[in-house]
Amino acid sequence: MTNQIRNITIIAHVDHGKTTLIDNLMKQSGSFRENEVVDERLMDSGELEKERGITILAKPASINWKDTRINIIDTPGHRDFAAEVERVLSMADGALLLIDSAEGVMPQTKFVLSKALKQGLKPIVVINKLDKADQRANEVLDETFDLFVSLDANEEQLDFPVLYASGRSGWADSELDGSRENLNPLLDLILNHVKPANFEKEKPFAMLSTLLYADSFLGRSLVGRITQGTAKANQSIKAINLKGEKVDEGKLTKIFRYEGTKKVPIEIGEAGDIVVIAGLEKANVADTICDLDVNEPISATPIDPPTMSITITVNTSPLAGKEGKKLTSTQIRDRLIQEAQNNVGITFNENEGNDSFVVSGRGELMLEILLTQMRREGFELTVSPPKVLYKTDDSGTKLEPIEEITMDLDEEYSSKVIDSMNRRKGKLIDLKDTGKNKKRLIFHAPTRGLMGYTSKFLTLTKGNGVINRIFHDYGQFEGEMEGRRNGALIAMEKGKAVAFAIFNLQARGEMFVTHNDPVYPGMIVGLSPKPGDMIINVMKGKKLTNMRTQGTDENVVLTPVRKMSIAEQLSMLNTDEALEITPDSCRLRKSILDPNERKKSEKSGAAA
């Protein structure tokens, strides 16, 4: 029987090993039965999370160690999901700061740590992946201390304990050359260093809703830490917003806590514990869930606003309905309502009259994840080019989101990368050596200039560079920026692309289609190296003769089509273009498919 509770969050950059470390903590602490089959990457519950190796939605888990229940919250490691991070930190008594022993301190680490320090958390520093051949643990420790200083950590926070670890091998040690036996030193340090918060158990029940899950059986499930009193099944409760206004009222139908990664029903939730409750259908994240006698809301951390938007409509291409099952604006609306309820980082507005939806999010990845999920669910969509969301200050000055970009690369590529960032109105903030012929560049640049830049960076560094981006602040608008220089190669008619035609057109530019791909008028089938759009015929086969048959068309050698992510394709769009997304395909297209109508639109736009 546990009699104490510790709530701890893990702060780490993408792919610094936090999910693997949590897996081994659970296994070594006995959170699973001996005969239980345990999947790898336990905390990455979503399909996309396991594929990409990133945490998208924060989720709690629990382990028992020496009569203490340790609730562990695995926080997102990508800047686009910072809305999750901010809420999760409010549930924590302490934090594990996990840093790769070779890569060192990275932007996402800095971002989340700054928020944790502002909330008064005192992190335990774990320098992970000590089994790497290029580990530089001592240097990384110095960098970490400098980071704490730069983030205005207080004296107690600067006096952080340090462990060296390998999450994959399942050990942690206070000494760099210690015995490296197991993870017990980390579990013991959590108990000794992280102090449980003091809560008033005698007061009426109250908790802040920090996470929200949709459950087909229970309905809306709210996750939070009980800050006072106890929660009992079947008691009357209500939800009040940050202004103290009642949002909902009802019965607490079910209450759960986490054992391992599973939800276990309980009758009573104690102050200090992280629980899941059901029974209120209108309550939302940042609402206070409480006893009917409570009228004072719990303060919630403000959430940073979205920085980018896209417009989504039904698929209007000639191929609509051939690959997907969810085709109507009503189905899109219902899906976006569901997303906005579960993910406060996403908002949307409906444009009356044309059945289009303006969806706003924190950045490229957040919007790409949503589109990828909808695609896998059977939706067919038409998506506009991304737009940056601007602000104005009190004096009326136009402001735009600025990001901090950290790049690690070979020295030979640095001049090309600096030149590419200058064209995107980036400002070089720092440049330093990180090893033999290695450089680290840090830029501040407008978000609008960075759409799809990751693929460009990887091309410039021949796949050897590492780039990381994080929201920095809103800054003064940097002026107009040059768009895509390449003209579009546009299909002339509907049908199937032919190898012979593609082969002869390859000299005119990069082709996006291969033999037998379906095409239609207005579809962008390639890019020209020159400015200006061009309508081409990708269906023109070789003329037949007595000596040749049509089958010889397919013997030509075609350049393989470049594989691009949704984010890359969105970044390529000009203002008069769109991206068709279906479960099986993504196709670049002109917003207006008919060439005559396009010309009329261009003339009217020029006249205006």
Language-model features: locations:
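Structural and coupling elements of P-loop NTPases
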Residues: M1-A608
